[in-house]
Amino acid sequence: MERGAAAAGALSCTFRSPSPSPTSPAAPHWRPLLGFRSRSRSRGRGWGQRAVVAGAPRLFLPPPCRRFRYCSQSKLLGTNKGQNRCSLATFSSFGQSGISLNNEDLVKDKLLIDCGEDQDCVIDGIVALGKFDALHIGHRELAMYASKAGTPFLLSFVGIAEVLGWEYRPPIVAQCDRKRVLTSWAPYCKNVVPIEYQVEFSKVRYLTPRQFVERLSRDLKIQGVVAGENYRFGYRASGDAAELVKLCEEFGLSAFIVRSVMDTARSYNGVTTSVNSSDKGQVSSSRVRHALAMGDMEYVSELLGRKHRLVLTVKENHLQERKRIMLPKSCMLNMPPADGLYENCDLLNGGHLGLCRVIINSETIVIEMKDENSLLPNTIQENQQLGIEFG
């Protein structure tokens, strides 16, 4: 769990809920991706009819992963963007949970913090597991499959760098901008906005893989999990996807293991030289950071599935002219691209202010508007947040 940040003890956590979609369900409910057996330990004919893509091969893994099949659907990144290749290996197991759904228990144990009337919001949900720092297309794929199986949630961890003593790096997505990004995923998630559920890493750092899954089942009372094939969890990342499936079966949860979304441009500009030894060509946050460091915004957009948005908070020492704004780099709330000149950008302040070009140097960010009438007096004010989307 050290590097994979994959454990969940819901002792101290914050719940971040985007604005509900008009088509979002009023309460969590189970929408099966495939047919599942009933909540009985009976083997035999208890299995439902499984909707498997014609011609898709079966995936056989050693015990205890006894029943897996492929549901072929995916997106490959690169020049041939229309091709699909990612697969979903699915295992489902239900047992008698013996779990009370009494909200008083949740409140008493302080499992969900500041959820208001939605104290039972995560109950019976399908939780996608990961770091979700970049919210890239691989993360979106996990949310998409979670929505096929039920009400989608993202379970991520905060404070990892501080706990492990890593050097500070600005986030790829500004914290205040995550809600917008998740809302943009609704068309991929059956018009449901995934809800992000964050846990303090310091509270779960030493959980074993078994304790992690037990917390998901006993404390959060979820219905199932979705994870990538390279997912690691538990203390010192000691658990892998196969063990996750085994433990989910034991605790009566469904487990959906999704193949990585591959980056067909993985050798582009030497990107593979910048990522860690576990990289096998999959879309990753490390690739996004490297592409930003190269200043290749087209490649960044492909990895993210959207334009990269740099968010800034206007400070009192900003300089505004008729067509020009100058801000210190200390205004930035997330990772910028490399120093340089960027054409065809968009400036936003809740609405669209206009097209601009952006010049980033070692100390400042200069925004030059295409239209001299875009920046009227008092358009930009102190403590206001601005967004720059790079074309």
Curated annotation (Swiss-Prot):
GO molecular function: ATP binding; FMN adenylyltransferase activity
A Pfam family hit: FAD_syn
Compartments in which it is found: Plastid, Chloroplast
Cofactor(s) required for function per UniProt: Mg(2+)
Enzyme class: transferase
Reaction(s) catalysed (UniProt annotation): FMN + ATP + H(+) = FAD + diphosphate
Domain of life: Eukaryota
Transit peptide endpoints, chain numbering: 1-53
A single GO cellular-component term on record: chloroplast
InterPro entries the UniProt entry points to: FAD_synthase (IPR015864), Rossmann-like_a/b/a_fold (IPR014729)
Enzyme nomenclature, EC number: 2.7.7.2
Residue span of region Disordered: 1-31
Annotated GO biological process: FAD biosynthetic process; riboflavin biosynthetic process
Sorted UniProt keywords: ATP-binding, Chloroplast, FAD, Flavoprotein, FMN, Nucleotide-binding, Nucleotidyltransferase, Plastid, Transferase, Transit peptide
Pathways per UniProt: Cofactor biosynthesis; FAD biosynthesis; FAD from FMN: step 1/1
Role summary: Catalyzes the adenylation of flavin mononucleotide (FMN) to form flavin adenine dinucleotide (FAD) coenzyme.
Name listed for the protein in its UniProt record: FAD synthetase, chloroplastic
